[in-house]
Amino acid sequence: MAIQYNYGTGRRKSAVARVFIKPGTGVITVNHKPADEYFSRETGRMIIRQPLELTGNTSNLDIMVNIHGGGESGQAGAVRHGITRALIGYDETLKPILSKAGFVTRDAREVERKKVGLRKARRRKQFSKR
């Protein structure tokens, strides 16, 4: 018999996370590494555990994540979004709890493009009066 996975795609900035959830012991692997090894900063590890702690599923689900693009913060946000979507597929009754916490909504903020004639997106050259 095939193992039943629940799937969720999470996105944040330019990072895309594909998350697979199955009943298990609470092991989280990100790109074939333990989550604690993959995310070097504590904030990243904390962000990916938020939906699990909120729903009380920290020790009864195994999570496998494939992620690409973005930096550490964006990837952590993408994993959180993916875990949230996969949890909703796993148990529909969790959706109101997760939406109230704001985990279901995709954070639409993206990097603003650099404009011609400026140093960065909004930074101008220093103005000299004389």
From Swiss-Prot:
SUPFAM superfamilies: Ribosomal protein S5 domain 2-like. Keywords: Ribonucleoprotein, Ribosomal protein. GO terms for cellular component: cytosolic small ribosomal subunit. The keyword Cell membrane does not apply. Transmembrane segments: none annotated. One of its GO terms (molecular function) is RNA binding. The keyword Ribosomal protein applies. Belongs to the universal ribosomal protein uS9 family. This is Small ribosomal subunit protein uS9. It comes from Nitrosomonas europaea (strain ATCC 19718 / CIP 103999 / KCTC 2705 / NBRC 14298). The gene is rpsI.
